[in-house]
Amino acid sequence: MNIGLINPAWGDRRRGVNSTSLYRCIPPQALLQLASLTPLSHEVDIVDENWSEIDFTRPYDMVGITGTTVQIPRAYAVADEFRKRGVPVVIGGPHVSFLPREALGHADSVVRWEADEIWTRVLDDVRTNRLKKVYNPKFPKSLDFTVHRPVSLVFRVETPSWLPLEIKAATIQIQRGCPHNCEFCSVTTFNGRRVKHKSIGYVTDEVKRAKAEGARFFLFLDDNIAADKEYAKELFEALIPLHIRWLSQTEINIADDDIIYLAVGASENCL
């Protein structure tokens, strides 16, 4: 099949350094993950509408769309346009995971929560005309997925025109879930309270591959990189000899543990 994976535009798609430019320039991690899990018998085209136009005339056999709440009006408009052309649309992401009935007004199928382990099944169901209205996969026990096609993790960071500098960065998600249940946050509901993570070797292999592609800076897309403190200590110790600069999110009580010194050490020895 010919598959189109689409990340809808954030708002007005104006390019330039503004409050949303960082979010817009980060590659759509969910789509990169699904592309890497797609068997080689299929063709995959990733379109990030923040940087390129969607070609609605392309002969896709199916379209997959992701989107947060701020993107969802555009996601639904894109889905409606493809369905007018007879293309099956599967939609996923945080917003539709919480509101699948709303999403079914614009898509043929909704994949809730984390799609990794059932993605190939969804593709088979599209191919055999057995697509379900809603898929409710279980949370994966491990994030060490077998990839069918390596997808580049590296992207160019947008910089002001007056700054003659090109920064190559890479995005890697190391773990999902958070043991807390903060009232303002959807992570626990979406990814669960049990922290799932990649093996240390899996992470360091991804870092080495991205460095070989020219990455000089890393964004670890975890919601709480120190959620599992023992794992975090092992992770930072493994990152120290790789000499990288990195950015991530964590909870403030990281300062109460010697883990913060390992985190600093994992970056201060960068070249």
Residue spans for each PLM region:
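Conserved SAM/AdoMet-binding glycine-rich loop
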Residues: 3-6, 200-271
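Acidic, low-complexity intrinsically disordered segments
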Residues: 1-213
